[in-house]
Amino acid sequence: SKVNYNVVPWATFTDPEVARVGLSEQDAKEQNIAYEVTRYQLDHHDRSLTDGEAHGFIKVLTQPGKDKILGVTIVGYHAGEVITEFVFAMTHGMGLKKISAVTHIYPTLGEANKFAANAWRSERLPQKYFPWLERFFAWYRS
């Protein structure tokens, strides 16, 4: 089968590690490709905290309004291993919704991928329902 060079990952084994697959923001800008950015900070990620490596981030570029992954950059502890789930998803045309739906073992570094996907989902919640939900939960708690 043909090699899809858009999904060939790379990693730099520094401290912290840097791993990437697909487009970076700079690539997308240079190619005039529209994108949205979702960023998940690893500062409060349980496994990273347990290992004393709670620094770094996962940055995911997606098509505007869609969960299609255009590129991922991970800076952090074992980034070269953590990125493989995104490589698999991009290779098989799966988006962030699929990653969000996967049950991950707790606490693992790979679980951060799910948190990044969930961050994407939470940024796209329908805002029109929030005032109603706030009133409902205020009533429910009283």
Q: What label would you give each PLM region?
A:
Residues S1-E17:
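Flexible, acidic loop-helix segments that line cofactor/substrate-binding pockets
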Residues F13-S142:
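Flexible, glycine-rich terminal cap/loop adjacent to redox cofactors
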